[in-house]
């Protein structure tokens, strides 16, 4: 994997067409929302001037994934600890299955977090991981996210 070949760009109408071709048939929508849901969330964030972005991920000029990191809107199911200060919510992160395991996801995650911090300020980050998604659990724990006992539906909350 050559980091110089990785690019991230804001998701827009044009590049979202290419994101539909990402191979993710091994990841249930119980684990990560569909692209259509991600685009709905993205449009909501844009319309309401939320802090954050949804990014398209490219490798060698080919669209291979997307990641959504936005300022969190409080949910009734959020733990009390999250209601004390503003935070970001990572809501979707998919890498085409042909490009996993080579460091692209790790690189993109850190780059997007850093960009969000630089643009909007440092805040805690929360995300949910389905209780049966052990691969995602390992990925996030290895990147300094802490698994909690709090759950929203079938998802455990993770904080960083």
Regions found by a protein language model. Give the residues of each.
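C-terminal "cap" of GNAT-fold acetyltransferases
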Residues: 3, 84-88, 122-137, 141-160
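Conserved glycine-rich acetyl-CoA-binding loop
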Residues: 96-110, 131-138, 142
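Acetyl-CoA-dependent GNAT
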Residues: 2-6, 10-98, 109, 115, ...
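Short glycine-rich loop/turn motifs that provide flexible caps or phosphate-binding loops at active sites
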Residues: 64, 102-104, 127
